[in-house]
Structure formats: C-alpha cells, structure tokens
Amino acid sequence: EWVKNAIEADKPVLGICFGGQLMARALGGSVAPGPKGEIGWTNIWSERQDLLSNGPWFQFHYDRWQVPPGGVEIARNPIASQAFIYGRSMGVQFHPELNAAVLKGWLDWGGLRDVGDDGQDPQIMMDQTVAEDPASKERTWHFAPKSSSL
C-alpha cells in the first residue's frame, strides 16, 4: 500500500529491479518467473531515449513484471519488459547503480553460484563491468535527473 500511495500522491519513485516489480504489483500489474533469468550486461530497446538509453545495462533477475494498468512500457528486450513509467515514477528491471565494487559485493555474498549456474565466468563479468563503468555512469546520469520531471 505504501508504494501505491506514494505513486498515486504524485511523488516521484524510482523502482530498481525488485523495486520495479514491487511497483508493478502494487499498481495492479503482476510479477511472474520469466522464460529465463538475466544475469550480466544486456542491451535493451528504449522508446524514450530522452529518458533512458538502450544500454547495455546490468541485469540480475529471474522474474518479470506485467506493466500495470495506466503504466507505459518504455523499454524492453526479448526476455522482459525493462522499464515503465507511471505518472512521475519509473520502474526499471536493470541495475543502474551497479559498478565493480557493487558487483564484487554481490558475488562475495552468494552471487558466484548464480553466475556459475548461468554458465558465466565471474571474472569475465567483472572485467566487463570495469570496462563498462564510465559509460554506465554516463547512461545513469542521463536518465536520473529527468526521472523527477516525468
């Protein structure tokens, strides 16, 4: 209820990954397992380049949302909806906050198993994250200030 009340009171909310799923469900959408998980750097297709670039963006999820009634999907890929707006709020399935330090923490706290189960090499993922970091920061700053003016 708190999430729904905040959004319906026209307070800007940014839901990241599970937070976006929580927003979708609170607003009348649904969340269910996707056809497969998404772990790692993934391209998305954005219909609102003024709000969100195509990426790549870092993913670490197994579920996906159904955009709630009144929400507008603004980005997707073949696996899942990747972003929606609802009033002044936005839900994103990916992790714009991710950098190498964050990924190291996730891997150290149990993510190594998930990455391995997904058939990926954690060192390659870390190397790609280090390489993506400058561009990822730029993409994140591109959409972050605009989120409050949706």
Where are these regions (language model features)?
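Glycine-rich, phosphate-binding/catalytic loops in enzymes
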Residues: 1, 31-32, 76, 108-110
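Short amphipathic alpha-helical segments and helix-helix/interface helices
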Residues: 3-4, 81, 144-145
